[in-house]
A protein has these predicted regions:
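Positively charged, solvent-exposed patches that mediate nucleic-acid binding
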Residues: 1-110
């Protein structure tokens, strides 16, 4: 996932999460906001309950890989992927299926 497609500012995270349009699964929560500008962007949030810094960074790398395979950047959506602590207990393929099903509910799927 290229850096231009990432959400980085705290106020942008807050704005998207305040809209309260979300889809959840056992390992992650997907917050969505329709936007009328340029391209889609994605933000990833991993809490400290997931593990130490190394574990959290590994999870972020995995999510970025999954998003590249699953997410269509042609749609005009800002999304935030919030990772739950159960994410590390599941296999990569299972987590990818949960992410795909969340994006299918939003209808932003490749």
């Amino acid at each position: 996932m290229k850096k231009q497609f990432r959400i980085k500012k705290n106020y942008e995270f807050d704005d998207i999460m305040r809209k309260k349009q979300f889809y959840s699964s056992p390992t992650l929560v997907l917050y969505v906001r329709k936007k009328k500008e340029e391209q889609s962007r994605v933000g990833i949030t991993v809490g400290k309950k997931v593990g130490g810094a190394v574990a959290r960074n590994k999870v972020k790398r995995q999510i970025r890989m999954m998003i590249d395979e699953v997410f269509s950047f042609e749609e005009e959506f800002d999304t935030i992927v919030l990772i739950r602590p159960t994410f590390t207990q599941e296999k990569y393929e299972t987590n990818k299926k949960f992410l795909e099903s969340a994006y299918k509910k939003v209808r932003i799927y490749k």
